[in-house]
């Protein structure tokens, strides 16, 4: 599904504004703001984070993914500001590609997962 690019005005007052470490405290703030935005057609989530707990990021992301599937008439948008590191990029990955935006100058950090290679000798 191709969505139109949102104009700048759509980001004036984000429904969800998060900053700091991705942790259970951030999740609580996220859920409170997310629940308060239940009537909004466009729900902008504006995080800035240097990282944190990837499993908490996945919990927030699953909330976004589930709401996107259950309420297709609503649009859930990510607007990264300043820094989106580590767990922040995990969270961003749950938003549809056409709903991922970054403010000018925002930095992303994406970790490469290295798997050890174990040889099995027969």
Regions inferred by a protein language model and the residue ranges of each:
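Terminal-region recognition feature
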Residues: 1-122
């Amino acid at each position: 599904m191709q969505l139109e690019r949102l104009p700048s005005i759509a980001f004036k007052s984000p429904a969800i504004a998060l900053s700091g470490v991705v942790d259970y405290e951030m999740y609580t703030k996220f859920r409170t703001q997310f629940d308060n935005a239940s009537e909004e057609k466009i729900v902008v989530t504006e995080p800035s984070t240097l990282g944190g707990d990837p499993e908490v990021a996945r919990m927030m992301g699953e909330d976004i993914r589930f709401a996107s599937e259950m309420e297709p008439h609503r649009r859930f948008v990510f607007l990264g500001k300043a820094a989106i590191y580590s767990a922040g990029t995990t969270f961003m990955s749950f938003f549809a590609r056409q709903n991922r935006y970054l403010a000018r100058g925002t930095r992303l950090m994406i970790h490469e997962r290295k798997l050890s290679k174990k040889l099995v000798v027969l």
